[in-house]
From Swiss-Prot:
Reactions mediated catalytically: glycyl-tRNA(Ala) + H2O = tRNA(Ala) + glycine + H(+); a D-aminoacyl-tRNA + H2O = a tRNA + a D-alpha-amino acid + H(+)
Name of the molecule in the record: D-aminoacyl-tRNA deacylase
Motif position, Gly-cisPro motif, important for rejection of L-amino acids: 142-143
Assembly mode: Homodimer.
This protein's domain notes: A Gly-cisPro motif from one monomer fits into the active site of the other monomer to allow specific chiral rejection of L-amino acids.
A Pfam match: Tyr_Deacylase
Protein keywords: Cytoplasm, Hydrolase, RNA-binding, tRNA-binding
HAMAP family: Deacylase_Dtd
């Protein structure tokens, strides 16, 4: 499983011109699911995203400006967007190979479980719409982007 996370000032997802999810400051996370992923790897990924320290600590003078706080500690939102293209192999040729991505039906079920778990761990969770043609708007803060992986 892979997640591309971005620290954002705000982000939203719309489908067919209708907003389906939005957050103010926090983390926009694109989630890619692979063949071997399961509920345990989904839970590990959510835990990693929620505890990954990508926000400055402006409270402690000794840590001023250091990336020392996570999204929960700054009361930020979490916007989860499914993104099978993160599982692409790009090492050969000039066309991505999506063979490493989980089949759509299984991925939809696992992504729903990932969302459900995230909502038990964090107050402010929004999502895109699985399998839809989504328009994602965000204002990156930094910008700070990280590619996270869990087995």
């Amino acid at each position: 499983m892979r997640a591309l996370i971005q620290r954002v000032k705000h982000a939203s997802v719309s489908v067919d011109g209708h907003d389906v999810g939005a957050i103010e400051h926090g983390v926009l996370a694109y989630i890619g699911l692979g063949h071997d992923d399961n509920l345990q790897s989904a839970q590990r990924m959510v835990d990693k995203i929620l505890t990954y320290r990508i926000f400055e600590n402006d409270d402690d003078p000794a840590k001023y400006g250091k990336l020392d706080k996570n999204v929960q500690q700054v009361d930020g939102g979490l916007l989860l967007v499914s993104q099978f293209t993160l599982m692409a192999k790009t090492d050969k040729g000039r066309r991505p190979d999506f063979g490493g991505a989980m089949a759509p039906d299984a991925a939809q079920d696992l992504f729903a479980q990932l969302i459900a778990y995230a909502k038990t761990q964090h107050v402010d969770v929004a999502t895109g719409q699985f399998g839809a043609d989504m328009q994602v708007l965000s204002v990156n803060d930094g910008p700070l982007n990280f590619l996270l992986e869990v087995p």
